[in-house]
Swiss-Prot record:
Substrate binds at residues 200-201. It is found in: Cytoplasm. Catalyzes the reversible hydration of carbon dioxide. Can hydrate cyanamide to urea. This is Carbonic anhydrase 1. Inhibited by acetazolamide. It comes from Macaca nemestrina. PANTHER family: CARBONIC ANHYDRASE, CARBONIC ANHYDRASE 1. One of its GO terms (molecular function) is carbonate dehydratase activity. Its cofactor is Zn(2+).
Length: 261
C-alpha cells in the first residue's frame, strides 16, 4: 500500500495527506486518543482468540517508511476470532510504528499519554471476502490488533524480528522470515478497547475494526534505535533513516470506544 506521494516529513506528511486522500478528514479516521473514563464497558464483547500457525510466516520487507512481516494467507491456519467479531479474520502481516525519540512513537494514545512504539497485527475478513485486496476497502474488511509499547526493559520476543532487519536495510529489500508466531508479542492480558476506524496511512480506508490492548509490552531504547536505523532510501542513494512513521491522533467525531473490561 506504500506509494511515493506520501510520507512522514513536513512536505508529504500527515498534515498534507488530505490533499491527495480527502478521506484523511473523514468521520472514522485512526488513530484516536482513548479516554478511559468515556470508554463504554460492553458485556457482549467476547474474549479475543488468536490462533497463529508459525509455519505461515513468510517474509520481511522494507517498504520505505517501515517494514512488514508478511504471512501466507491462502487458508485459515492463522486467524483472529472473538471480541466484537462474528466472522473469522485471517492474519496477513504485522508492522510497527515509532517516533524520532522515545517520548512518542505510538499512534494511539491513552488519556493523552503517548507510548514509544506501537505494534499492528493486520487481519482481513476471510469469511466474507476472497482476498486482502478485496477486503481492504470494505467497512468490515479488516481487523487490526494494536499493542502499545513502553520504553523500558529489552523485549526478548522482538529479537528474531530485529535480527532480520540487517537483511532489509534499504527500501524494496525482502528476505525470508519463517517459523514465527506473532501472538508471542501480545501482552499477557488481552483486555481491550475496540472502535471503528481506518488504516493509519494512505489510502486511509475506513475499513478497520481496531482492537487496542489495554496492557502494553516493553521495548528497550536500543531496540527502538534499531527500528530507526532502517533506511527509507533505495540501495545506492544517500542514506535516509526511517526516523518516524506515526500519524497524530484524529477526532472521534461521535464514535464510541467500547471496553471489554
Amino acid at each position: 500500500m506504500a506509494s511515493p506521494d506520501w510520507g512522514y516529513d513536513d512536505k508529504n506528511g500527515p498534515e498534507q495527506w488530505s490533499k491527495l486522500y480527502p478521506i484523511a478528514n473523514g468521520n472514522n479516521q485512526s488513530p484516536v486518543d482513548i479516554k478511559t473514563s468515556e470508554a463504554k464497558h460492553d458485556t457482549s464483547l467476547k474474549p479475543i482468540s488468536v490462533s497463529y500457525n508459525p509455519a505461515t510466516a513468510k517474509e520481511i520487507i522494507n517498504v520505505g517508511h517501515s517494514f512488514h512481516v508478511n504471512f501466507e494467507d491462502n487458508d485459515n491456519r492463522s486467524v483472529l476470532k472473538g471480541g466484537p467479531f462474528s466472522d473469522s479474520y485471517r492474519l496477513f502481516q504485522f508492522h510497527f510504528h515509532w517516533g524520532s525519540s522515545n517520548e512518542y512513537g505510538s499512534e494511539h494514545t491513552v488519556d493523552g499519554v503517548k507510548y514509544s512504539s506501537e505494534l499492528h497485527i493486520v487481519h482481513w475478513n476471510s469469511a466474507k471476502y476472497s482476498s486482502l485486496a478485496e477486503a481492504v476497502s470494505k467497512a468490515d474488511g479488516l481487523a487490526v490488533i494494536g499493542v502499545l509499547m513502553k520504553v523500558g526493559e529489552a523485549n526478548p520476543k522482538l529479537q528474531k524480528v530485529l535480527d532480520a532487519l540487517h537483511a532489509i536495510k534499504t527500501k524494496g529489500k525482502r528476505a525470508p522470515f519463517t517459523n514465527f508466531d506473532p501472538s508471542t508479542l501480545l501482552p499477557s492480558s488481552l483486555d481491550f478497547w475496540t472502535y471503528s476506524g481506518s488504516l493509519t496511512h494512505p489510502p486511509l480506508y475506513e475499513s478497520v475494526t481496531w482492537i487496542i490492548c489495554k496492557e502494553s509490552i516493553s521495548v528497550s531504547s536500543e531496540q527502538l534505535a534499531q527500528f530507526r536505523s532502517l533506511l527509507s532510501n533505495v540501495e545506492g542513494d544517500n542514506p535516509v533513516p526511517s526516523q518516524r512513521n506515526n500519524r497524530p491522533t484524529q477526532p472521534l467525531k461521535g464514535r464510541t470506544v467500547r471496553a471489554s473490561f
